């Protein structure tokens, strides 16, 4: 099964200062009819989450100005329903533990392939859907 099919009904926000990554993912998503919005900085990402709801929020850790962890922390407050993915080129224990503490769903290390990222996103969405269904049954 094509993991892009799992993303067609989901809106994705990508925040990354790397133009190649932004352009590559935007092209990959749009050619598969998967909605994506890209931002170069955390500040642009915050503007995006004020303007629309996202199912998936992906952020690079190293960004100019506010870092990706601080951005995702704010994004989680505004859009707690979103799956949060942190992209990082650095294996840093503090970064990982802080990311888990603030609710980051998954990590992906650079370099990564579009195929690997899309598979991770599809899996994360499925997992979240199952967790919500279990939570809804538990409340009844």
List PLM regions with ranges.
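The feature encodes the CheY-like receiver
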Residues: 22, 64, 92
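Acidic catalytic/metal-coordinating carboxylates
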Residues: 41, 67-70
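Short amphipathic alpha-helix used as the core "switch/output" element in two-component signaling
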Residues: 47, 69-81
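Acidic, metal-coordinating helix/loop segments flanking the phosphotransfer/catalytic sites
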Residues: 38-56
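Active-site residues of response regulator receiver
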Residues: 60, 88
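Two-component/phosphorelay signaling modules centered on CheY-like receiver
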Residues: 19-37
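Alpha4 helix (beta4-alpha4-beta5 surface) of REC/receiver domains from two-component response regulators
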Residues: 70, 91-106
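Non-catalytic signal-transmission and effector/linker regions of two-component phosphorelay proteins
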Residues: 1-11, 115-140
């Amino acid at each position: 099964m094509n993991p892009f099919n799992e993303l067609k009904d989901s809106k994705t926000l990508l925040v990354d200062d790397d133009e190649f990554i932004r352009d590559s993912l935007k092209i990959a998503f749009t050619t598969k009819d998967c909605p994506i919005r890209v931002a170069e900085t955390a500040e642009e990402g915050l503007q995006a989450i004020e303007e629309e709801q996202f199912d998936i929020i992906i952020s690079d850790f190293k960004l100019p100005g506010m870092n990706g962890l601080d951005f995702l922390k704010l994004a989680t407050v505004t859009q707690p329903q979103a799956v949060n993915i942190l992209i990082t080129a650095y294996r840093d224990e503090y970064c990982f533990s802080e990311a888990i503490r603030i609710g980051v769903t998954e990590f992906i290390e650079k370099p990564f392939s579009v195929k690997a990222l899309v598979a991770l996103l599809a899996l994360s969405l499925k997992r979240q859907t199952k967790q919500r269904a279990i939570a809804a049954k538990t409340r009844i």
